[in-house]
Amino acid sequence: MGRAPVELTDRPEAPRDRTLCPAAGPVGLARASGSDGGHGISATKVFTLDPSTAGNNPEGVAWDSRSQTFFVGTVGTGTIYRASLRDTTLRPFITPPAADPADSAVGMKVSRGKLYVAGGTTGSIYVYDIRTGALMARFETGSGGFLNDLVVTEEGDVYVTDSFRPMLWHLTRAMIKAGTGTPQAINVGPEIAYTTGQFNLNGIVARRDGRELIVVSTFSESLFRIDIDRHNSAARKITKIDAPALAGDGLLIDRGQLLVVTGDPAEVTVLNLSRHDSRARVSKVLTDSSMHGSSTIAHAENRYLVVNADFTHSALPFTVSALPRGRSESHH
């Protein structure tokens, strides 16, 4: 786990330099002096999906600190790959049967021995046993949507973004424990505008014990704060965050900063958040020659795992770039 969130004032931070993480040699992380905070990690490591097949692009990633393994989902067959940080190759761990329409494993998170997966166009949310790979539960939201990313709060609730329908989907802790139930729909309009045929809400993270969510709309290049009342979804409050325009995909909160992944250009923009998350200012931008068409990110020990979905070119083999996390910076 990273450091506790650093609370900032509402004063905007000045933009900082773009940072290149070379695949070999010293890393130019801001103020890192070519090392990862004393952990000895100074170069990007690249993991390869084996097999890598055309049309089965990787998209989601999740890290399990207990087993020291990470998982990568794909959107062609729904196959979920697995590897440890010591490996160089990701291999299939969960392969949906041919009769199962789980052809998309998009956003994913690990919590309490379970792997939660957003099912894209299937409209399903899957819960797997992280030890055996067995399907423990499946929750349906109906057709017409694209379940893109999800977050599990400290209370055990799950919130899922829908890129095509203007709503969040909420699984309560009780539903997950029972393994059944109908996901609750939380309307995000009119505050968050949806454009038909485009990817709207995408990445999502939780703050303040799950009472606050931060989401990104890819098409409108906007970040939003959603204050949640888990007992009354109609009471939610949505506020647009004053932030640079970013066509973000995956999001990550680390050391109190918000990391936003974009595919074109393939970068990770690190944002400093104000005290009440009303503003976000660029701290630095991470990139690497191994990154292309990047989709999302996870924090794994002293690395950031960045998935190279590469939907534009789909060059084989598909890869995951493990960037050095770098030492934390002081915020003023």
For each feature predicted by the language model, list its residue ranges.
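Beta-propeller domains
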Residues: 72-92
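Blade-level signature of beta-propeller repeat domains, shared across WD40, Kelch, NHL, RCC1
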Residues: 296-332
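Short loop/turn segments that connect beta-strands within beta-propeller blades
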Residues: 84-88, 129-134, 172-176, 227-232, ...
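Hydrophobic alpha-helical segments and helix pairs
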Residues: 127-183
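A short helix->beta-strand "capping" segment at the edge of beta-propeller domains
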Residues: 37-55
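Beta-rich, blade/repeat-based domains predominating
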Residues: 52-68, 97-116, 141-159, 190-212, ...
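Conserved beta-strand positions in repeat-built beta-propeller and related beta-rich domains
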Residues: 64-65, 70-77, 116-122, 158-164, ...
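Structural signal for beta-propeller blades
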Residues: 78-81, 123-125, 166-169, 221-223, ...
